[in-house]
Amino acid sequence: MALQLLTPSFSFQHSPSPHKLTTLRYTHHRIRCTASAPSYSDLVRRRSANYKPSKWDSNFVETLESDYKKENHEMYIEKLMGDVKHLMKEVVNPIEKMELVDTIQRLGLGYLFNKEIKEVLNTITTSKATLKTKKDLHAVALQFRLLRQHGYEVSPDAFHEFKDEKGGFKESLCMDIKGMLCLYEASHLSFQGEVVLDEAREFTSTHLKAIGGNIDPVLLKKVRHSLEMPLHWRMLRLEARWYIETYDEEDRKNPSLAELAKHDFNSVQTIYQRSLKRMSRWWRDLGLGERLEFSRDRLVECFFWTTGVIFDPQFERCRGVLTKVNQLVSTIDDVYDVYGSLEELELFTDAVDRWDIRAMEQLPEYMKICYLALYNTTNDIAYEALKEEGLDVIPYLKKVWTDLCKSYIVEARWYSNGYKPTLEEYLENAWTSIAGPVALVHAYFSFGQKMPFEALNYSNTSSLIKWSSMIFRLCDDLATSSDEVARGDVPKSIQCYMYEAGVSESVARDHIKYLIDEAWKKMNECLVYNTPFLQPLINAGLNLARMAHCMYERGDGHGFSNELDKKRVLLLLAEPFKFM
């Protein structure tokens, strides 16, 4: 199946028009989930996913507190900020300017210097000085990556300069390890049809894997890190943590940059800790985890997901909304995948579609609790958007939840009937059932800005949501499909392709990895032709795909987390940098 056959179908064109304030009634129907104990029917045969308890309990969250106090370092941080701004003006050489921008971004400081970075990139695109770098592989690749990453129109044709008369990349390039590494990273920002970048990735990955240990140890460390997963696919806040430590090992490091990066990381970490405590109290008060014992209680994991998608400290409200959404998705997913009978699930889907408090009367007790949690939480989120930005977003939030539940019920019917969908049929439903659209639409209305409704129907927005969710789905399937099918679930993309093409699991997995590569190319196209107000959503879409790689890199990091997942949570949320 060719991935390009799947065209974006995400649209709000048929959504009801936003209501006037005077017609809002949903805030008057808030009902607590603790009204009565659930009554589980013994007549329905229930499945079990055998999920283990979360590695993180409420005690971990409540005792989470950093010794770092930003207010004790305010004057020093201001000085460091000034030093970096001065440095960005002082550096004249175009290559050194690009390297400085790249370093600032990789240290996690890009959000502090957006204006200065934009000025540098604008200068690069208009300056003839960069023409002198066209024979420098490192410079050409770095310029391409930075410009494309920031949405500039840039052609990969410059890389043809590094080919020989036979059309292949020159073997002499293998001596330039720094340039090869930069070209490898740049190749991951390709669009469909950019063959030279496909060739560049194959050429550089082959030769970088073959290098010995006879090179600068810091450069070797970067090569191995990149081959493990390219920068463009990495969870950026964890990458910043890794790069801060690596930058400390460099002989030519800038002390002000190194110090500022550590202070910023610690400062943002304290914001995360405060937010997580607030989310923990929300989840405890909601009572859903205790009432529905069959479902995954994964508040910390959901918050970790959220910080990967929305990591900028100024979007604290958005992180709160997205954490709630992620935990509700996790719970409702377990209702559909694990516990509910098909008849019950049909009723629940209908109730969500109606979005009426009276719809819960038809539900079994355990579903009433789940429905109320969804109804109340979503309406609270909508009320906040109405209060802060004057936007009535309930029709849009209701639509993505309805679409999600309808995609869940399709899979439940497939499972009940023993139906095996084609890969294309599966993916047309599965990019919605992975809940990417739910997450991104809620994020869109929670950035603290008055976001225009019509932007959700832009073709670029539809593509962003579609391909980000597709990467999320395919990464999830690579990591979890065997366990999910074993416990009784619809065939996933791997199994669908095995049945359809008559191939082994190994071949099917390679095909899914190919589809992930192709989906990234479609995602990369969303970086160009965007408008400024869509930039937070574009970043969130990219980061959602990156978090999929992070969480499913070595198994199911959400349902069955391992020691690597635990280490990552601690690095991001619990362990500050120490100062001498």
From Swiss-Prot:
The keyword Ligase does not apply. Its EC number is 4.2.3.-. Expressed in developing and mature fruits. Barely detectable in leaves and shoots. CDD domains: Terpene_cyclase_plant_C1. InterPro entries: Isoprenoid_synthase_dom_sf, Terpene_cyclase-like_1_C, Terpene_cyclase_plant_C1, Terpene_synth_N, Terpene_synth_N_sf, Terpene_synthase-like, Terpene_synthase_metal-bd, Terpenoid_cyclase/PrenylTrfase. It is found in: Plastid, Chloroplast. It catalyses: (2E)-geranyl diphosphate = alpha-thujene + diphosphate. This is Alpha-thujene synthase, chloroplastic. It comes from Litsea cubeba (Aromatic litsea). The gene is TPS2.
